[in-house]
Amino acid sequence: MPKMKNNKGAAKRFKKTAGGIKYKHATKRHILTKRTTKNKRQLRPNSLLPRCEVAAVARMLPYA
């Protein structure tokens, strides 16, 4: 049986930790002048994936 492959896009975006699956918020790369300071601050911390989406991401990352 061939090896299963990780979804490369998901592998770059998600990291499996003991507490769950961690990800970074979107819209935080460039052209941030139109965003308020409050909005940029709220996007700063990494978040844990909601429980309803964990199974889908786990299927994309079989070796994580």
UniProtKB/Swiss-Prot annotation:
The keyword Zinc does not apply. The keyword Ribonucleoprotein applies. It comes from the Bacteria. SUPFAM superfamilies: L35p-like. GO terms for biological process: translation. Belongs to the bacterial ribosomal protein bL35 family. This is Large ribosomal subunit protein bL35. It comes from Vibrio vulnificus (strain YJ016).
